[in-house]
Amino acid sequence: MGSEMCIRDRLSHAEDWLVFPENIGESICIDETAPSNGELYTIVSNRSSRGGKGTIIAIVKGVAADAVTEALMRIDEDKRLLVKEITMDMSNSMRLIARRCFPNAMRTIDRFHIQKLACDALQEMRIAHRWDAIQADTDAREEAKCLGEAYTPIVLANGDTHKQLLARSRYLLFKSADKWTESQRQRAEVLFETYPDLKEAYSLTHSLRMIFSKNTVKDAARLSLARWYNKVDDSGFKSFNVIAATLYEHYDEVLNFFVNRATNAFAESFNAKIKAFRAALRGVTDIKLGQCKKLRGKFINCYLCLQIHSLWS
């Protein structure tokens, strides 16, 4: 009976927040997710639970620091002070939440968010070249048409036109060179020969990835990042200079990764589980408490989170 009352009490405010103080641990993650219709939620989870029972510490509608802080402050202070490390992305709201609610915790920026910024910058450069290639191809076609000549695009060494080369190179730029297929290797050679700036940008992205991949200590990583900053500065690439400035702003929190090598990969994986759970119950509008009791165990927290009525719309 007491357990049912507890569940009923949680469901009464589930539209806005759910908190599970008993699930707090020394190493936690905070991340945002959009399980339905693009509506954002902030999820705080316990890394040691590994996605099983006791994983979710809190789920709050929205990402506003004040709203999330208000919900997390419902957890007793002595429990919040037990948290030793919190992993997160580089958003100011996440940093503020962590500082307010878990003052004893070391704040660690997720390495994968950093690497994604570099990949996005590289892809931005590729896309810019592709638009230029499309424009050049269109102009050449129009010129040939005006002259009454047949248009034949330039074909590169691997059989691609410039447009095709830039379109088909998207996925290989995400991968390390040692993981390229033979055709990707050939395409990369042509790409880098034709667009040297993409080769340099790819090298910057790869070197940043390698800094985080090496099992090194914090001081050594500090030196490696300083060298990377110098390379970025020498390149003159605007998008990479923006990344370098962002990393510099979060310098200590970025370097904290090398203490325990903690990431938000677990949180991202668990968020995917929540989305899958939401999709499996698409169309359900009214689930009775008796049915809720059947979901005890591994996914009880997921179920309670997904009782937020906007997720069921």
Question: Which residues does each PLM region occupy?
Answer:
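Conserved beta-strand -> loop -> alpha-helix junction used to position metal-binding or nucleic-acid-contacting
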Residues: D89, R99-E142, E268
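Short, small-residue-biased leader/transition segments that mark boundaries at the very start
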Residues: M1-I7
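Acidic, glycine-enriched active-site microenvironments
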Residues: K61, K84, S213, L223, ...
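Basic, amphipathic alpha-helical segments enriched in Lys/Arg and hydrophobic/aromatic residues
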Residues: Y229-S313
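Helix-loop elements that line ligand-binding/catalytic pockets
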Residues: T152-G236
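RNase H-like nuclease fold core
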Residues: L11-E85, M90-R100
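Hydrophobic "anchor" residues on beta-strands that sit immediately upstream
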Residues: S27, E85, M106-I109, N264
